[in-house]
Amino acid sequence: MKTLVLLSALVLLAFQVQADPIQNTDEETKTEEQPGEDDQAVSVSFGDPEGSSLQEESLRDLVCYCRKRGCKRRERMNGTCRKGHLMYTLCCR
């Protein structure tokens, strides 16, 4: 059940990332790595207002990052992110 919820959240996150309008400016189209570019945080929360077993501590706040180079310690690879034509690794903890 937890796996199903996690996968559903990741699918919804992927749809949201693809649906966001992309604004191309000169700064955004540079392929050079900018400071802090590896740490694009995405926060995902689970649960309903009345409370359920899904609101356990491990599922309450799932924080994901789109990283250029592999995941850091305590993070797991959960898929890919796309910003424009560039692909990133989706790392969650």
Swiss-Prot record:
Origin: domain of life: Eukaryota
Leader peptide range in chain numbering: 1-16
Record keywords: Antibiotic, Antimicrobial, Defensin, Disulfide bond, Secreted, Signal
Alphabetical GO biological process terms: cellular response to lipopolysaccharide; defense response to bacterium; defense response to Gram-negative bacterium; defense response to Gram-positive bacterium; response to xenobiotic stimulus
First-listed, main subcellular location of the protein, grouped into a coarse class: secreted
Region feature (Disordered): 22-56
Gene Ontology CC: extracellular space
Stored PROSITE patterns: DEFENSIN
Residues that make up the propeptide removed upon maturation: 17-58
S-S pairs: C64-C92, C66-C81, C71-C91
Record Pfam families: Defensin_1, Defensin_propep
Location within or outside the cell: Secreted
InterPro entries linked to this entry: Alpha-defensin, Alpha-defensin_C, Alpha-defensin_N, Beta/alpha-defensin_C
Tissue occurrence: Paneth cells of the small bowel.
PANTHER family found in the cross-reference section: ALPHA-DEFENSIN 1, ALPHA-DEFENSIN 1-RELATED
Family named by the database record: Belongs to the alpha-defensin family.
Function noted in UniProt: Probably contributes to the antimicrobial barrier function of the small bowel mucosa.
Protein name according to UniProt: Alpha-defensin 3
